[in-house]
Amino acid sequence: MTAVSLGIPAVPPPPLAPRRASRQIMVGSVPVGGGAPVSVQSMTTTLTADVNATLQQIAELTAAGCQIVRVAVPSQDDVAALPAIARKSQLPVIADIHFQPRYVFAAIEAGCAAVRVNPGNIRQFDDKVKEIAKAAGDAGVPIRIGVNAGSLDKRLLAKHGKATAEALVESALWECSLFEEHGFRDIKISVKHNDPVVMVRAYRQLAEACDYPLHLGVTEAGPAFQGTIKSSVAFGALLAEGIGDTIRVSLSAPPVEEIKVGAAILESLGLRERGLEIVSCPSCGRAQVDVYKLAEEVTAGLEGLPVPLRVAVMGCVVNGPGEAREADLGVASGNGKGQIFVKGQVIKTVPEGQIVETLIEEALRLAEEMGAELPEELRSLAGGATVTVH
């Protein structure tokens, strides 16, 4: 007799499948594939030729937690800027090459950590593979075969009718085979599409067909809200199956926002240690406090807190006490006041107007107890200082 036959739900499988076995490459100092942690990357939006602006944006990405950065190289002026950027960047730099095979050699010579090539729009690319493989191999520079639905080779479009998952995979594996003929396997692959369903199907096929590390991305995902949804759905499905070694959330938004979303996706799946997590109820007719405002003010007040801390902001006595007790720190609100919980214990009850101030003070105290080095803007608030929320 089984649990199912007794009407008892079977023991659920682990939430995530084991990571897919893949080769490992090094993008600068960052391992990709081979069981390494899933890395988060982004792409600069500056003119690469503007070295100072590009380095400034890379510094902002570094502070946000980015691990690898890609820069566009559409012109000779951009090529000329690569040596300075590669030398001064705090992150490994990937040169993004389209149309011009000769720029690949220039990027390798400039000291870039990796090169992305798009086989769909480099006409002479196939003829240059032998030379590229030798140059990249000699320099220890990996190549990303970056296939994109928007620039798929016309021959494959004619064969498949449109940019199907099968067409994307065929393009990627064909280009990989050309490198393999010359003994070069320091490769990672991406097969991006703007439709998450097609994208997921393509990566699943690719994961079964090869052992190269995979870079996940939904191309042209859209503005921040839409792009976040598309990437979260697609990445969540694949990463839960163990597929994916590095990710880039493409958003029509500042690059730093891509890093925030990417890191949050990994944290949500348990693939990265959680940072600050605000748990708040969606509010309903039972709420006796403005939950939206409380949650926003607590989030803003603790931005940059470098510890895995769960803070619950609850608006009523139904789920509030339970959620607050499960969190590291929380409040259950009602009747113009809030019960403050720390590690499951009520430590005080404060007037509604002091809830945000108290939560921030207690969060900073817990962070210091955990040995966290607080950012300058938070350090002055620690130690019981009064917090003013505007």
Swiss-Prot record:
Associated pathway: Isoprenoid biosynthesis; isopentenyl diphosphate biosynthesis via DXP pathway; isopentenyl diphosphate from 1-deoxy-D-xylulose 5-phosphate: step 5/6
Source species, domain of life: Bacteria
Cofactors that this protein relies on: [4Fe-4S] cluster
Record field: catalytic activity: (2E)-4-hydroxy-3-methylbut-2-enyl diphosphate + oxidized [flavodoxin] + H2O + 2 H(+) = 2-C-methyl-D-erythritol 2,4-cyclic diphosphate + reduced [flavodoxin]
Transmembrane feature ranges: none
InterPro entries associated with the record: Dihydropteroate_synth-like_sf (IPR011005), IspG_bac (IPR016425), IspG_bac-typ (IPR004588), NO2/SO3_Rdtase_4Fe4S_sf (IPR045854)
Keywords, in A-Z order: 4Fe-4S, Iron, Iron-sulfur, Isoprene biosynthesis, Metal-binding, Oxidoreductase
Free-text remark on how the cofactor is bound: Binds 1 [4Fe-4S] cluster.
Gene Ontology molecular function: 4 iron, 4 sulfur cluster binding; 4-hydroxy-3-methylbut-2-en-1-yl diphosphate synthase activity (ferredoxin); 4-hydroxy-3-methylbut-2-enyl-diphosphate synthase activity (flavodoxin); iron ion binding
E.C. number: 1.17.7.3
Keyword check for Iron: yes
GO biological process: isopentenyl diphosphate biosynthetic process, methylerythritol 4-phosphate pathway; terpenoid biosynthetic process
Residues noted as binding [4Fe-4S] cluster in the record, renumbered to the chain: C281, C284, C316, E323
Family matches, as Pfam families: GcpE
Function of the molecule: Converts 2C-methyl-D-erythritol 2,4-cyclodiphosphate (ME-2,4cPP) into 1-hydroxy-2-methyl-2-(E)-butenyl 4-diphosphate.
PANTHER family according to UniProt: 4-HYDROXY-3-METHYLBUT-2-EN-1-YL DIPHOSPHATE SYNTHASE (PTHR30454), 4-HYDROXY-3-METHYLBUT-2-EN-1-YL DIPHOSPHATE SYNTHASE (FERREDOXIN), CHLOROPLASTIC (PTHR30454:SF0)
Family of this protein: Belongs to the IspG family.
Xref: HAMAP family: IspG
Protein name, entry field: 4-hydroxy-3-methylbut-2-en-1-yl diphosphate synthase (flavodoxin)
Lineage, broadest ranks: Bacteria, Bacillati, Actinomycetota, Actinomycetes, Micromonosporales
